[in-house]
From Swiss-Prot:
Its EC number is 7.1.1.-. Disulfide bonds: none annotated. It comes from Aethionema cordifolium. It comes from the Eukaryota. It is found in: Plastid, Chloroplast thylakoid membrane. This is NAD(P)H-quinone oxidoreductase subunit H, chloroplastic.
């Protein structure tokens, strides 16, 4: 009887671009030696739509609906970066009330993004039950978005100089109720997931990334903070009004997939702290209060002029002044950035004294973070690829643009 010949040559496997664990249309060409990964080549570009070139042929107000299609799970951040650039170029001041509402929306969007990362990440490594609990909480966030903006996703809420509309009746109370509820659910996640021995076996020590290596690769966000680097643009740049709130940078030093999970879980708790402080300190309070005071002001026109002027203050508005659709970008260049859920989202903007930007360069965090994938999966097992890729947290709309 002849024995079968054992083949010792390498095997090449195509994963994607429609594999459910790819989180979009990503293709991986993986070279295997048995079950060990020798090499991995990501193939990008399946979702490229020419977002940068479109920006150069649109006014900013026309381009705003497009930007929500980059990272379509954290659209508030793409809107924020789109209006921040023209605001800085035109020296446009944003009312404090609008800035507070922006922070609330950004942090809710961060929570929604992290939740939508956590559910599929757990499903990737074989845990189906948390997926349904996590999507239940995500629905509450989307209900808040729908009440405030009219849209569950693709909100189109930010405007140059402020926001599109003030918060509706009862929204603040509803949001505070959600914050109290969600903090208890995060504790449940920790009991259900963090101490699970099967989960720890899949993520602990998998995809280890050192701090110096993370800096050299230009990584940002939870990928960087999970490697021991305390870097958060909300603390560094102090954009909007983040410097007025008390919160801490969440970081870990192990640099593995577990550390990246812990950073994101802790960030959701910190986001709730920021939202609660912003809701309690919102200039003018709920919209109902502002409207009632405005009505009282009209009814009592003979009241003290100082009291009248107090509630007509610039800081109580939701937008400074609506710019013209032909708003011109001054002839200078500027780089603006925000701390998105996946890392540093930036735009390099060049104006040329016209309504259209001369150059609109997008720096997507997912695209930069994905470059480290081949290094992280080498010498790992084939099954670990999904764990490592999931821990990076990519959205292909943002990667390919």
């Amino acid at each position: 009887m002849n024995r079968p010949v054992t083949r010792k040559d390498l095997m090449i496997v195509n994963i994607g671009p429609h594999h459910p664990s790819m989180h979009g249309v990503l293709r991986l060409i993986v070279t295997l030696d048995g079950g060990d990964v020798v090499d991995c080549e990501p193939i990008l570009g399946y979702l490229h739509r020419g977002m940068e070139k479109i920006a150069e042929n649109r006014a900013i107000i026309q381009y705003l609906p497009y930007v929500t299609r980059w990272d379509y799970l954290a659209t508030m951040f793409t809107e924020a970066i789109t209006v921040n650039g023209p605001e800085q170029l035109g020296n446009i001041q944003v009312p404090k009330r609008a800035s507070y509402i922006r922070v609330i929306m950004l942090e809710l969007s961060r929570i929604a993004s992290h939740l939508l990362w956590l559910g599929p990440f757990m499903a990737d490594i074989g845990a189906q039950t948390p997926f349904f609990y996590i999507f239940r909480e995500r629905e509450f966030v989307y209900d808040l978005f729908e009440a405030a903006t009219g849209m569950r996703m693709m909100h189109n809420f930010f405007r140059i100089g402020g926001i599109a509309a003030d918060l509706p009746y009862g929204w603040i109370d509803k949001c505070l109720d959600f914050c109290d509820y969600f903090l208890t659910e995060v504790v449940e996640y920790q009991k259900l997931i963090t101490r699970n021995p099967i989960f720890l076996e899949r993520v602990e020590g998998v995809g280890i990334l050192g701090g110096e290596e993370a800096i050299n690769w230009g990584l940002s966000g939870p990928m960087l903070r999970a490697s021991g680097i305390q870097w958060d643009l909300r603390k560094v740049d102090r954009y909007e009004c983040y410097d007025e709130f008390e919160w801490e940078i969440q970081w870990q030093k192990q640099g593995d997939s577990l550390a990246r999970y812990l950073v994101r879980l802790s960030e959701m708790t910190e986001s709730i702290k920021i939202i609660q402080q912003a809701l309690e300190g919102l200039p003018g309070g709920p919209y109902e209060n502002l409207e009632r005071r405005g009505f009282d002001r009209k009814m009592n026109s003979e009241m003290n002029s100082e009291m009248n002027s107090e509630w007509n203050n610039f800081d109580y508005r939701f937008i400074s002044k609506k710019p013209s659709p032909t708003f011109e970008l001054s002839k200078q260049e500027l780089y603006v950035r925000v701390e998105a859920p996946k890392g540093e989202l930036g735009i390099f903007l060049i104006g040329d004294q016209s309504g259209f930007p001369w150059r609109w360069k997008i720096r997507p965090p997912g695209f930069i973070n994905l470059q480290i994938l081949p290094e992280l999966v080498k010498r790992m097992k084939l099954a670990d690829i999904m764990t490592i890729l999931g821990s990076i947290d990519i959205i292909m709309g943002e990667v390919d643009r």
